[in-house]
Design a protein with these regions (language model features):
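A short SAM/SAH-binding and catalytic strip from SAM-dependent methyltransferases
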Residues: 65-78
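Class I SAM-dependent methyltransferase SAM/SAH-binding core
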Residues: 1, 7-56
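A short acidic, Gly/Pro-enriched loop at the edge of an enzyme's catalytic core
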Residues: 55-66
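Short glycine-dipeptide loop
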Residues: 20-21, 90-95
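Conserved catalytic/acceptor-binding region of the Class I
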Residues: 97-162, 176-179
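C-terminal lobe and adjacent flexible extensions of AdoMet/dcAdoMet transferase-like proteins
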Residues: 143, 166-196
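A short glycine-rich, Lys/Arg-flanked "PGG" loop and its adjoining helix->strand segment in the class I
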Residues: 80-92
Length: 196
């Protein structure tokens, strides 16, 4: 089960990995994302997509072997409700994998600190929880999850080209800032500065 499956890229890989004897299930609250996922996986017979929130998944208790959540819990208002639902769905000794970003540490560093801070502070509004990895283990323990392990994955981008994640993130942040009312000239200046 992929919680917050988006366009279905991970479900496609899971479905191919588990083969026809298994099933890859994706959930997402966005009907347009579910439509995209269904289209991407249309040639696979072992997929199921459900448009729903993570706290109310229409599946039987103890029915899934593993749950993945990639960059999802940042956007869930009530994390405990979603974790309780995931725990309900997991078979005994099944695995839950979560990957989350420490968004408060995710930033670009151009020469003008005030402008960088403005863009960083505005982008904080893009999700409900900026620092999921700092508290998730405690929540999991309180809800009865066992064998909790954390692996830190640090990454630093040293090159920025048109095909890099840094360029994608810059565009995402710029568009978000514009949607929140930051003046276009400030956003353009920020983009110009971080290109240097």
């Amino acid at each position: 089960l992929d919680v917050g499956c988006g366009g279905g890229q991970l479900i496609e890989d899971i479905a191919k990995s588990v083969g026809i004897a298994g099933k890859a299930i994706g959930i997402d609250p966005s009907s347009s994302q579910i439509s995209s996922a269904k289209e991407l996986c249309s040639g696979l017979e072992n997929t199921l997509f459900i448009c729903c929130l993570a706290n109310n998944i229409d599946l039987e208790s103890e029915s899934v072997d593993a749950v993945a959540s990639i960059q999802t819990f940042e956007y869930i208002d009530d994390i405990d409700e979603a974790l309780t639902e995931i725990k309900r769905l997991l078979k005994p000794r099944a695995k839950f994998l979560n990957i989350s970003t420490l968004w408060d540490y995710y930033r670009f560093h151009g020469p003008e600190k005030k402008l960088n801070d403005l863009m960083h502070d505005v982008f904080k509004e893009h999700c409900s929880h900026q620092m999921v990895p700092t508290f998730l283990n405690g929540r999991l323990k309180n809800l009865g999850f066992k064998d909790i392990k954390t692996t830190e994955l640090a990454y630093v981008f040293t090159k920025r080209d048109e095909n890099s994640f840094a360029k994608y993130a810059e565009t995402l942040i710029a568009n978000f800032a514009l949607s929140k009312g930051v003046e276009k000239d400030k956003v353009s200046e920020w983009q110009k500065q971080i290109k240097k």
